[in-house]
Amino acid sequence: MRENTGKVVLVGAGPGDTGLLTLKGEKYIKQADCLVYDRLSSPEFLSMAKAGCELIYVGKENHNHVMKQDAINELLYEKSKYHELVVRLKGGDPYVFGRGGEEALYLVDRNVEVEVVPGVSSSVAALAAAGIPITHRGIAKGFQVITAHSRKDEEADIDYSLLTDETITCVFLMGLAHVKSIAAGLMKAGRRADTPAAVISNGTLAAQRKCIGTLADIGEKIEEAKLTSPAIIVVGDVVSLNDRLDFFEKRPLFGRKITVPYIKTNELIAKLQQLGADITPVKTGTGAGCSSAPEGSP
Protein backbone atom coordinates (compact mmCIF):
# COMPACT_ATOMS: atom_id res chain seq x y z
CA MET A 1 0.00 0.00 0.00
CA ARG A 2 1.21 3.50 -0.86
CA GLU A 3 1.89 5.99 1.93
CA ASN A 4 -0.24 8.53 0.05
CA THR A 5 -3.04 7.84 -2.38
CA GLY A 6 -2.32 8.01 -6.08
CA LYS A 7 -4.15 10.05 -8.68
CA VAL A 8 -7.44 9.00 -10.27
CA VAL A 9 -8.27 10.29 -13.74
CA LEU A 10 -11.78 9.98 -15.15
CA VAL A 11 -11.34 9.60 -18.91
CA GLY A 12 -14.17 9.90 -21.41
CA ALA A 13 -13.68 7.19 -24.04
CA GLY A 14 -16.05 8.88 -26.46
CA PRO A 15 -18.97 7.32 -28.36
CA GLY A 16 -17.25 4.06 -29.30
CA ASP A 17 -15.03 4.74 -32.31
CA THR A 18 -11.47 4.63 -30.96
CA GLY A 19 -10.52 7.34 -33.44
CA LEU A 20 -12.68 9.75 -31.44
CA LEU A 21 -10.75 9.22 -28.19
CA THR A 22 -8.92 12.42 -27.28
CA LEU A 23 -5.13 12.56 -27.35
CA LYS A 24 -5.07 13.35 -23.64
CA GLY A 25 -7.33 10.40 -22.89
CA GLU A 26 -5.07 8.07 -24.87
CA LYS A 27 -2.01 9.38 -23.02
CA TYR A 28 -3.51 8.56 -19.63
CA ILE A 29 -4.68 5.11 -20.73
CA LYS A 30 -1.12 4.29 -21.83
CA GLN A 31 0.32 5.52 -18.51
CA ALA A 32 -2.25 3.88 -16.22
CA ASP A 33 -1.17 1.41 -13.54
CA CYS A 34 -4.79 0.37 -13.08
CA LEU A 35 -7.61 0.70 -15.62
CA VAL A 36 -11.20 0.47 -14.38
CA TYR A 37 -13.47 0.28 -17.41
CA ASP A 38 -17.11 0.07 -18.39
CA ARG A 39 -18.73 -1.88 -21.19
CA LEU A 40 -16.73 -0.44 -24.08
CA SER A 41 -17.40 -0.81 -27.78
CA SER A 42 -13.90 -1.79 -28.86
CA PRO A 43 -11.15 -3.95 -27.35
CA GLU A 44 -8.68 -1.51 -28.89
CA PHE A 45 -9.08 0.74 -25.84
CA LEU A 46 -7.64 -1.98 -23.62
CA SER A 47 -4.84 -2.80 -26.04
CA MET A 48 -3.48 0.69 -25.39
CA ALA A 49 -2.71 -0.18 -21.75
CA LYS A 50 0.90 -0.87 -20.83
CA ALA A 51 2.18 -4.29 -19.83
CA GLY A 52 1.37 -5.04 -16.21
CA CYS A 53 -1.56 -2.63 -16.01
CA GLU A 54 -4.30 -4.02 -13.76
CA LEU A 55 -7.52 -4.26 -15.80
CA ILE A 56 -10.81 -4.27 -13.88
CA TYR A 57 -14.16 -4.64 -15.66
CA VAL A 58 -17.13 -2.96 -13.96
CA GLY A 59 -19.42 -3.03 -17.01
CA LYS A 60 -22.77 -1.31 -16.73
CA GLU A 61 -25.73 -1.58 -19.06
CA ASN A 62 -29.47 -1.56 -18.55
CA HIS A 63 -30.61 -4.24 -16.08
CA ASN A 64 -27.12 -5.78 -15.93
CA HIS A 65 -24.67 -4.12 -13.57
CA VAL A 66 -21.54 -6.14 -12.85
CA MET A 67 -20.83 -3.77 -9.97
CA LYS A 68 -23.09 -1.23 -8.27
CA GLN A 69 -22.09 2.42 -8.36
CA ASP A 70 -21.29 2.59 -4.63
CA ALA A 71 -18.95 -0.37 -5.03
CA ILE A 72 -17.24 1.29 -8.02
CA ASN A 73 -16.68 4.44 -5.98
CA GLU A 74 -15.05 2.44 -3.18
CA LEU A 75 -13.01 0.39 -5.66
CA LEU A 76 -11.48 3.54 -7.15
CA TYR A 77 -10.57 4.76 -3.68
CA GLU A 78 -9.01 1.44 -2.67
CA LYS A 79 -7.00 1.16 -5.90
CA SER A 80 -5.66 4.69 -5.42
CA LYS A 81 -3.94 3.39 -2.26
CA TYR A 82 -1.92 0.89 -4.29
CA HIS A 83 -1.34 2.59 -7.65
CA GLU A 84 0.24 5.88 -8.65
CA LEU A 85 -2.22 6.37 -11.53
CA VAL A 86 -5.71 4.89 -11.71
CA VAL A 87 -7.72 5.58 -14.86
CA ARG A 88 -11.49 5.28 -14.77
CA LEU A 89 -12.46 4.79 -18.42
CA LYS A 90 -16.06 5.70 -19.15
CA GLY A 91 -18.06 5.75 -22.37
CA GLY A 92 -18.90 9.15 -23.84
CA ASP A 93 -18.13 12.02 -21.48
CA PRO A 94 -17.78 11.35 -17.74
CA TYR A 95 -20.07 14.26 -16.86
CA VAL A 96 -22.83 13.63 -19.43
CA PHE A 97 -25.10 11.13 -17.66
CA GLY A 98 -21.99 9.12 -16.83
CA ARG A 99 -22.14 9.51 -13.03
CA GLY A 100 -18.63 10.90 -13.18
CA GLY A 101 -19.54 13.66 -10.77
CA GLU A 102 -20.50 11.11 -8.12
CA GLU A 103 -17.21 9.26 -8.49
CA ALA A 104 -15.18 12.47 -8.43
CA LEU A 105 -16.93 13.79 -5.30
CA TYR A 106 -16.46 10.48 -3.50
CA LEU A 107 -12.72 10.62 -4.15
CA VAL A 108 -12.31 14.33 -3.42
CA ASP A 109 -14.07 13.85 -0.07
CA ARG A 110 -11.33 11.30 0.75
CA ASN A 111 -8.51 13.63 -0.31
CA VAL A 112 -7.69 11.75 -3.51
CA GLU A 113 -6.33 13.85 -6.37
CA VAL A 114 -8.81 13.73 -9.27
CA GLU A 115 -8.63 14.90 -12.88
CA VAL A 116 -11.35 14.69 -15.52
CA VAL A 117 -10.59 14.28 -19.22
CA PRO A 118 -13.70 15.14 -21.26
CA GLY A 119 -14.86 12.79 -23.99
CA VAL A 120 -16.83 13.26 -27.19
CA SER A 121 -20.46 12.73 -26.22
CA SER A 122 -22.57 10.32 -28.25
CA SER A 123 -25.35 12.91 -28.04
CA VAL A 124 -23.43 14.87 -30.68
CA ALA A 125 -21.18 12.30 -32.37
CA ALA A 126 -23.82 9.67 -33.14
CA LEU A 127 -25.97 12.31 -34.79
CA ALA A 128 -23.08 13.50 -36.94
CA ALA A 129 -22.34 9.92 -38.03
CA ALA A 130 -26.00 9.55 -39.02
CA GLY A 131 -25.95 12.73 -41.10
CA ILE A 132 -27.89 14.80 -38.56
CA PRO A 133 -26.42 18.15 -37.41
CA ILE A 134 -27.61 18.81 -33.88
CA THR A 135 -28.03 22.51 -34.76
CA HIS A 136 -28.48 24.13 -38.16
CA ARG A 137 -29.02 27.77 -39.04
CA GLY A 138 -32.66 28.44 -39.84
CA ILE A 139 -33.77 25.03 -38.55
CA ALA A 140 -32.47 24.39 -35.03
CA LYS A 141 -31.07 27.15 -32.84
CA GLY A 142 -30.25 24.89 -29.90
CA PHE A 143 -30.59 21.43 -28.41
CA GLN A 144 -31.63 19.61 -25.27
CA VAL A 145 -30.11 16.32 -24.10
CA ILE A 146 -32.37 14.27 -21.85
CA THR A 147 -31.89 10.95 -20.13
CA ALA A 148 -34.82 8.60 -20.69
CA HIS A 149 -33.56 6.21 -18.03
CA SER A 150 -34.26 6.54 -14.31
CA ARG A 151 -32.20 5.46 -11.30
CA LYS A 152 -34.48 2.44 -10.87
CA ASP A 153 -34.01 1.11 -14.44
CA GLU A 154 -37.40 2.49 -15.41
CA GLU A 155 -38.53 5.18 -17.81
CA ALA A 156 -37.55 8.62 -16.56
CA ASP A 157 -40.23 11.08 -15.46
CA ILE A 158 -39.89 13.62 -18.28
CA ASP A 159 -41.68 16.99 -18.29
CA TYR A 160 -42.56 17.15 -21.99
CA SER A 161 -43.98 20.66 -21.64
CA LEU A 162 -40.35 21.85 -21.55
CA LEU A 163 -39.60 20.20 -24.91
CA THR A 164 -42.16 21.82 -27.21
CA ASP A 165 -39.98 24.42 -28.98
CA GLU A 166 -39.72 23.22 -32.60
CA THR A 167 -36.47 25.15 -33.11
CA ILE A 168 -34.75 23.02 -30.46
CA THR A 169 -33.43 19.54 -31.25
CA CYS A 170 -34.30 16.97 -28.58
CA VAL A 171 -31.85 14.13 -27.95
CA PHE A 172 -32.84 11.28 -25.63
CA LEU A 173 -30.20 8.92 -24.26
CA MET A 174 -30.82 5.40 -22.96
CA GLY A 175 -34.42 5.37 -24.18
CA LEU A 176 -34.72 2.62 -26.77
CA ALA A 177 -37.32 0.73 -24.74
CA HIS A 178 -39.42 3.88 -24.37
CA VAL A 179 -39.55 5.30 -27.92
CA LYS A 180 -43.34 4.98 -28.22
CA SER A 181 -44.06 6.67 -24.90
CA ILE A 182 -41.54 9.44 -25.60
CA ALA A 183 -43.15 10.15 -28.98
CA ALA A 184 -46.60 10.10 -27.41
CA GLY A 185 -45.50 12.45 -24.63
CA LEU A 186 -44.05 14.96 -27.09
CA MET A 187 -47.17 14.93 -29.27
CA LYS A 188 -49.45 15.31 -26.25
CA ALA A 189 -47.38 18.31 -25.16
CA GLY A 190 -47.83 19.95 -28.57
CA ARG A 191 -45.11 18.73 -30.93
CA ARG A 192 -46.38 18.05 -34.47
CA ALA A 193 -47.10 14.42 -35.30
CA ASP A 194 -45.08 14.84 -38.53
CA THR A 195 -41.99 16.10 -36.67
CA PRO A 196 -39.00 14.14 -38.05
CA ALA A 197 -37.54 11.62 -35.62
CA ALA A 198 -34.67 9.15 -35.73
CA VAL A 199 -33.25 6.33 -33.65
CA ILE A 200 -29.52 5.63 -34.04
CA SER A 201 -28.10 2.33 -32.78
CA ASN A 202 -24.35 1.83 -32.18
CA GLY A 203 -23.59 5.32 -33.40
CA THR A 204 -20.09 5.95 -34.88
CA LEU A 205 -19.38 2.20 -35.09
CA ALA A 206 -19.26 -0.02 -38.15
CA ALA A 207 -22.37 -1.73 -36.75
CA GLN A 208 -24.29 1.56 -36.80
CA ARG A 209 -27.92 1.41 -37.89
CA LYS A 210 -30.55 4.11 -38.00
CA CYS A 211 -34.30 4.29 -38.34
CA ILE A 212 -35.93 7.45 -39.71
CA GLY A 213 -39.57 8.40 -39.27
CA THR A 214 -41.85 10.89 -37.56
CA LEU A 215 -43.22 11.14 -34.05
CA ALA A 216 -46.36 9.44 -35.34
CA ASP A 217 -44.67 6.31 -36.68
CA ILE A 218 -41.14 6.00 -35.24
CA GLY A 219 -42.30 3.55 -32.56
CA GLU A 220 -43.63 1.07 -35.11
CA LYS A 221 -40.64 1.53 -37.41
CA ILE A 222 -38.03 0.66 -34.79
CA GLU A 223 -39.94 -2.49 -33.86
CA GLU A 224 -39.70 -3.60 -37.49
CA ALA A 225 -36.02 -2.61 -37.68
CA LYS A 226 -35.18 -4.49 -34.45
CA LEU A 227 -32.54 -1.98 -33.36
CA THR A 228 -30.42 -2.77 -30.32
CA SER A 229 -28.85 -0.74 -27.50
CA PRO A 230 -26.99 1.49 -27.12
CA ALA A 231 -29.29 3.81 -29.05
CA ILE A 232 -30.09 7.50 -29.23
CA ILE A 233 -33.43 9.11 -30.08
CA VAL A 234 -33.40 12.40 -32.02
CA VAL A 235 -36.44 14.61 -32.55
CA GLY A 236 -36.46 17.75 -34.68
CA ASP A 237 -36.46 19.08 -38.23
CA VAL A 238 -32.68 18.59 -38.52
CA VAL A 239 -33.39 14.86 -38.93
CA SER A 240 -34.66 15.62 -42.45
CA LEU A 241 -31.10 16.50 -43.52
CA ASN A 242 -29.78 12.97 -42.93
CA ASP A 243 -30.04 11.75 -46.54
CA ARG A 244 -27.89 14.57 -47.85
CA LEU A 245 -25.35 14.63 -45.02
CA ASP A 246 -24.85 10.93 -44.25
CA PHE A 247 -21.21 10.29 -45.17
CA PHE A 248 -20.78 7.45 -42.69
CA GLU A 249 -23.06 4.77 -44.11
CA LYS A 250 -22.10 5.62 -47.70
CA ARG A 251 -18.53 4.37 -47.29
CA PRO A 252 -17.74 1.49 -49.67
CA LEU A 253 -17.34 -1.27 -47.05
CA PHE A 254 -19.96 -0.07 -44.58
CA GLY A 255 -21.71 -3.00 -42.92
CA ARG A 256 -19.27 -5.61 -44.24
CA LYS A 257 -18.02 -7.97 -41.51
CA ILE A 258 -14.37 -8.94 -41.92
CA THR A 259 -12.21 -11.11 -39.63
CA VAL A 260 -8.47 -10.42 -39.69
CA PRO A 261 -5.45 -11.54 -37.62
CA TYR A 262 -4.70 -9.05 -34.84
CA ILE A 263 -1.42 -7.15 -35.12
CA LYS A 264 -1.00 -4.10 -32.90
CA THR A 265 0.18 -1.87 -35.75
CA ASN A 266 -1.90 -3.47 -38.50
CA GLU A 267 -2.32 -0.82 -41.20
CA LEU A 268 -4.75 -3.07 -43.05
CA ILE A 269 -7.18 -2.97 -40.10
CA ALA A 270 -7.01 0.83 -39.99
CA LYS A 271 -7.62 1.11 -43.72
CA LEU A 272 -10.56 -1.30 -43.69
CA GLN A 273 -12.10 0.60 -40.77
CA GLN A 274 -11.75 3.88 -42.65
CA LEU A 275 -13.71 2.29 -45.49
CA GLY A 276 -16.48 1.33 -43.08
CA ALA A 277 -15.82 -2.37 -42.49
CA ASP A 278 -16.83 -4.04 -39.22
CA ILE A 279 -13.53 -5.64 -38.18
CA THR A 280 -13.17 -8.58 -35.80
CA PRO A 281 -9.47 -8.94 -34.82
CA VAL A 282 -8.50 -12.42 -33.65
CA LYS A 283 -5.39 -13.74 -31.92
CA THR A 284 -3.03 -15.92 -33.89
CA GLY A 285 -0.34 -18.11 -32.33
CA THR A 286 0.89 -17.34 -28.82
CA GLY A 287 2.09 -13.78 -29.24
CA ALA A 288 0.60 -10.79 -27.49
CA GLY A 289 -2.61 -9.65 -29.05
CA CYS A 290 -6.16 -8.63 -28.47
CA SER A 291 -9.22 -10.82 -28.55
CA SER A 292 -12.50 -9.77 -30.09
CA ALA A 293 -14.00 -9.07 -26.65
CA PRO A 294 -12.59 -6.98 -23.79
CA GLU A 295 -10.77 -8.94 -21.11
CA GLY A 296 -12.99 -9.42 -18.12
CA SER A 297 -16.18 -8.89 -20.10
CA PRO A 298 -19.04 -11.24 -19.34
Task: Please state what every model-predicted region is.
Residues 43-44, 63-65, 121-125, 142-145, ...:
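Short gly/pro/ser/thr-enriched loop/turn and capping motifs at secondary-structure boundaries
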Residues 78-80, 133-145, 215-226, 297-298:
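A polyampholytic, Gly/Pro-enriched intrinsically disordered region
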Residues 44-47, 98, 124-126, 181-182, ...:
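Phosphate- and divalent-cation-binding pockets in alpha/beta enzyme and binding domains
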Residues 70-75, 129-132, 159-160, 211-217, ...:
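Short, surface-exposed amphipathic charged segments that create phosphate/polyanion-binding patches used
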Residues 1-18, 23-120, 224, 231, ...:
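Class I S-adenosyl-L-methionine
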Residues 2, 6-8, 82-86, 150-271, ...:
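A contiguous loop/helix-start segment that scaffolds small-molecule binding in enzyme catalytic cores
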Residues 17, 93-95, 100-166:
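Class I SAM-dependent methyltransferase SAM-binding "motif I" and its flanking Rossmann-like core
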